[in-house]
Amino acid sequence: GSGGIGASITKLRATGSPLKSSFGGSSSGPTPFAKILDTSIRAVQRGGKKVGALCFYMENWHIDFPEFLDWKHNAGDDYVRMRTANTAAFLSDEFMKRVEAGKDWYMFDPAETADLNEITGREFSVRYAHYIEKADKGELRMFKKVPAAEQYRQILVSLQSTSHPWLVWKDTINTRALNNNTGTIHMSNLCTEICLPQDKENVAVCNLASLNLAAHIKNKEVHWGRLEESVRLAVRQLDNLIDINVLPIPEAAKSDRENRAMGLGVMGFADTIEQLGMAYDSEHAWDFADRIFEFVSYMAIDESANLAVERGSYKNFNGSMWSKGYVPIDTIKKLSEERGIAVTVDNQSKHKGLNWDLLRAKVKKGMRNATLMAVAPNANIGLVVGTTPGIDARFAQVFSRNKISGKYMDINHNLVKDLKNMGIWEKVREAIIENQGDISSIPHIPQHTKDIYKTAFTTSPLAYVEVAARAQKWVDQALSRNMYLETRDIDETMSIYTTAWKKGLKSTYYLHMKPRHTAEQSTTKVNKAE
């Protein structure tokens, strides 16, 4: 298919790197090869309606990384620009620590430092220091040296300008991987939520589904019994899907069959907390994220362990961290130890009644699936089912939708319902529409309601980090975490993304800057809320 593909290009030798097979010849670097893929992915369309989707991943010790940062810029030679594919920087803990310490960052030719691509954590740091020593002694053909903070700044300036490259943390992903016995994870996928190892014999495949959290709210409370049923059913459905999958290449079929990886996610988080009367940037919402993701994680793991009893464990189970009785939350401590810096997120259970020790003993006996959870962005299917996408805050309270039948206005039904219950909907309706859904300046609306119905750009960016950090504790793969910023202050942006790393996020997705976004209003006059 032409779905959401991730491609690591870190192994491609540097521009100007000597070729052994060509007398006096040298490599043209990663760009021309990436350009071939960029063009190819556009040529392959799904149903003739949607072009292919690809994200290139590069580790930032590659000497061509500065050129990689320019791939998504509009200006410049089209030959060195990627018009279809996306880009993501695969960053190590060593790099982040060098940024914090004000140290230099060295970039190398992978032809001389190939093992850096395969190692992680402290082992990477030791080997990286070895190559720095060799470079300083003149024992490497080519290298570059820049202040680490300067390169970090360049990454984030590019991110602000083009929304690329997305920031993904290699060591956080690999250190916390419960399927770490099957190799190094070199990349994520298009949407930065999949974390699976891959090599020439195994092309990673993940089978996804998303639960609508908002459909599990009854009388302003979570219907935990119904949610448990949904999680267990989804795990069984995805496991059944693996058995009937028809994949285009044998390497993908092999990986799918031997690892049985799935990624159960959620949508409607913002919709759910609105119904529960919580503001996205409140401690209540963060604790709720902690509890709901812990619950989903527990039930998904338990059902996979049940399936292992019924149908057998996945082929590569023995030797995995699952087989040693680990569950996702246990890897937070492992990450802190590997970094030598404590991950700044609480790793305690928040959901009473879940016996994790009992589940650890159960998991040790067998798991049907190598991975269980991954939170996709769900931008389209969230709209289709009438809820908010993934774990994102609501982008606007009023926006227009384009459908085959035409364009029409959509208003947040939770907001309308609350305002009607207060008896002020008719009084404030026109003001809300005129303000494009921004209710912050409308005097008749109580402050607690304004807090609940903040939109993406009026919500603190640190709230996005905190919600993701609370969820990531329990998720064995990753979360597609969009970020929304009003500020263009680069130091503030650096601080936000550094906080994300410190709190244990594995990845981030698009960065949306406020000046580039407006919610278009429908031209249809709205007299009544549907």
State where each predicted segment sits:
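Polar, glycine-rich mid-to-C-terminal structural blocks
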Residues: 70, 79-155, 159-162, 336-340
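Inter-helical turn/loop segments and adjacent helix faces that build the functional surface
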Residues: 44-56, 75-82, 106, 137-145, ...
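Catalytic alpha/beta core of large soluble enzyme barrels
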Residues: 194-197, 238-243, 348-353, 361-368, ...
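Flexible, glycine/charged-enriched surface loops at secondary-structure junctions
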Residues: 4-8, 48-55, 106, 166-169, ...
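Internal maturation/activation junctions in enzymes
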Residues: 230-253, 279-378, 447-450, 480, ...
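A glycine-rich phosphate-binding loop feature that marks nucleotide/adenosyl-phosphate handling sites
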Residues: 10-16, 56-64, 88-90, 111-119, ...
